[in-house]
Regions:
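Short, contiguous pre-domain boundary segments
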Residues: 5-8
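A polyanion-binding, active-site-adjacent surface
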Residues: 2, 14-162, 166-169, 174, ...
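A non-catalytic structural micro-motif
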Residues: 194-196
Length: 222
């Protein structure tokens, strides 16, 4: 049985006992036994471990983990300190500087965001090395759909930041009118100039949180 160590354990108890997660678990046993996969099996649920269900102020939804060695550690778009900053995160930092004047960090670790209530969730939580989206059909999509549905039930407002088509596909589960959705193109170099740059997601998130009486996010990572 998975143990997150906070209120997600109770919130997701039915999901972890359900047929879909049992199927995921069997798939991962085989994948991690026979292939190099990321993140480490101990980091798969880091997004939930770092950000308790009742602490979530904002959700930044990614696609699947980085698939090269040393990058993924269970938080969407984040890499551990000392790892080269990936292109999508470089663009996120550029938009952060344009939006709020915060200079790009010298590292790519976003744990500071997660500890403040920013759920850095990927739609798919694992990947085989060097093969992007290789675990997309193992059941993770349904599992993270269920997470979004649980967050939608919250009676405290949340900002959902959806970058790119994959993330925007989950908008259908955000039906509670108290929440706020920010959507744009993905920050990857292939699409960032199609609407990500200039979308001001960070200031818009904080403006909404302040209007709801919620402490804004300090978007610095240093």
């Amino acid at each position: 049985m998975v143990r997150i160590g906070n209120s997600w354990d109770e919130i997701l108890a039915d999901e972890f006992r359900g047929e879909n997660y049992l199927k995921i678990r069997e798939f991962l046993k085989d994948e991690y036994s026979h292939h190099v996969c990321y993140p480490s099996m101990y980091d798969i649920f880091n997004a939930l471990k770092y950000t308790d269900y009742y602490d979530v102020k904002a959700v930044i939804l990614g696609q699947d983990p980085y698939h090269e060695e040393g990058q993924a550690h269970g938080l969407s778009f984040s890499v551990k300190k000392g790892v080269e900053i990936p292109p999508s995160l470089q663009n996120i930092y550029k938009e952060l500087q344009s939006d709020l004047g915060i200079p790009p960090a010298k590292h790519g670790c976003l744990e500071n965001w997660a500890r403040q209530g920013v759920l850095l969730l990927n739609s798919v939580l694992t990947v085989r090395a060097h093969l992007a989206n290789s675990h997309k059909n193992c059941g993770w999509q349904q599992f993270t759909d269920d997470i979004i549905k649980k967050l939608n039930e919250r009676d405290t407002p949340i900002v959902f930041i959806l970058w790119g088509a994959n993330a925007r596909s989950k908008k259908q589960y955000i039906t509670n009118p108290i929440h706020y959705v920010i959507e744009s193109a993905h920050p990857s170099p292939l699409s960032a100039y199609n609407g990500f740059f200039g979308s001001r997601p960070f200031s818009r998130t904080n403006e909404f949180l302040k209007s709801a009486g919620i402490e804004p996010v300090d978007w610095r990572t240093e």
